[in-house]
């Protein structure tokens, strides 16, 4: 995991006694691979204001204009990516993405106090199919309102209704 925060752009709004900060963080993430296995990962940037303030605003998101990796699928449901790792492929163990951070608040110290992280979640193929089906329901990509409904993926064959399992880690930025 390597991240490179670029120099933040700061705009001052003296009439409101506020600043607006925009910063790009370039991330190269090496994903674990297993032989003869199809692994899926959810990648979700998160940000947390350490001191809740009604007049402050902070957001972090994947920059969709950045070069898209064909293994990554945008999931607006989680404001992140679903990545399908290709087992046994040379040179495809890592993924590069660009995060865009925006902050509106009183001062630069407030921006620097933000807790930014990248949540990486390893999920089963069944759970990946579930997320994709939910994304298709939420964003039907041009389906007519009166077309056949899309069903959410389910795994009821075992009788337990378990979609899949996951493990996650939060990587601080």
Residue ranges of model-derived segments:
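A sequence/structural signal for flexible, mid-protein segments enriched
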Residues: 1-173
């Amino acid at each position: 995991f390597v991240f490179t925060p670029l120099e933040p752009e700061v705009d001052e709004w003296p009439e409101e006694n506020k600043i607006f900060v925009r910063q790009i963080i370039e991330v190269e993430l090496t994903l674990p691979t297993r032989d003869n296995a199809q692994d899926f990962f959810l990648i979700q940037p998160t940000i947390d204001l350490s001191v809740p303030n009604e007049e402050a605003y902070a957001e972090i998101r994947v920059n969709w204009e950045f070069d898209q990796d064909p293994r990554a699928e945008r999931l607006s449901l989680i404001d992140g990516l679903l990545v399908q790792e290709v087992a046994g492929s040379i040179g495809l163990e890592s993924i590069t993405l660009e995060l865009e951070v925006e902050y509106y608040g009183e001062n630069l110290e407030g921006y620097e106090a933000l807790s930014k992280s990248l949540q990486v979640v390893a999920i089963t193929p069944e759970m990946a199919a579930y997320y994709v089906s939910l994304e298709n329901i939420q964003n039907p990509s041009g389906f007519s309102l009166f077309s056949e409904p899309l069903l959410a993926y389910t795994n009821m064959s075992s009788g337990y209704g378990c979609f899949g399992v996951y493990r996650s880690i939060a990587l601080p930025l």
